[in-house]
Amino acid sequence: MKNLSYLLLLVLAISVTSCLSNYKESSKSLVIRGDYFGQTPPGDSARLFAPGIISTGMNERDFAITPDGNEIFFCREAGNYRYATIFYSRRSDDVWSSPEVFEFCTNPEYKYIEPHLSPDGTKLYFISTMTADSASEGNEDIWVCTKRDGEWSEPRNLGAPVNATSKEYFPSVTVDGTIYYTHPDTATNEESIFRSRLVDGAYQVPEKLGPNVNIGRARYNAFVAPDESYIIIPAYGMPDSFGATDYYISFRDSLDNWSQPVNMGPGINSTFAREWSASVSTDGNYLFFMSDRMGSTSLGKLSTETLQGFHNSPQNGNTDIYWISTKILDELREKARF
């Protein structure tokens, strides 16, 4: 009986391995062409982005695309955030490569999240727990790669005064090099949104943004427009929230005042909890955002196959990436009050 059980388990393992191998090969052999993986651009309604290619059923978040539209970065998490890394896809002769782990983000001892590209596409910023000596895991710091001759350089730690002994998250950079990011306020220990100006090639002492940006009971992962005209803020504990965390937007005037935050509405926010990573494409046409909203499709009769299919599909309760036209930002701007 033991031998029979062992034999059955062996056959099952071989079958599963074969299926996974075939799936991997078929995914790699799929030819994907066109802008944004050949996806139909969204209008006023949010669409799931690249289902089966980027939005797969795993936890996906943090989207960035180069100005020429030929390189895409995003993040995947697994094992309840035990593993988190950045994936990369490149288009050559109009054919996209299958998304793979970015070459500098392969060490399972570290986390790599929140990729962000400078407006000119020459610098890639991201968060990692890696350390300079690679001896142990450190705090989350901002790292940066520079593009030279079409290739990305080894990442370097951005250093002080932006990085400190505490954790930093979600870098977002303007045309003039100003960097916005999340960092604990030393006075309150609350995660808050800071910015540091770049002057003569050196970052200045970070300043905490005011109460129209640091909103709610918690706020983090703010995306700032390249021209610094608006900032998108995921915030928790707001009185008009649709769910646990919603996306809000604040607009900036010529005197560096920020408007009262505006909830970005039910087209973007939902009653689900995890909505805390947004970005706008470098061409300014599309807003990308993370959400764990569920799909509306019924499974029908429950079975091993239907549950496995649901588990391995987007809109299953893990986070996915959505996109929508940035025309919605113009509509929200009309609601801004200073």
Description of each model-found segment:
Residues 1-5:
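Positively charged n-region of N-terminal signal peptides that target proteins for export
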Residues 6-14:
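Sec-dependent N-terminal signal peptides
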Residues 17-18:
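C-terminal motif of bacterial Sec signal peptides marking the signal peptidase cleavage site
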Residues 21-338:
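Short, conserved micro-motifs composed of acidic
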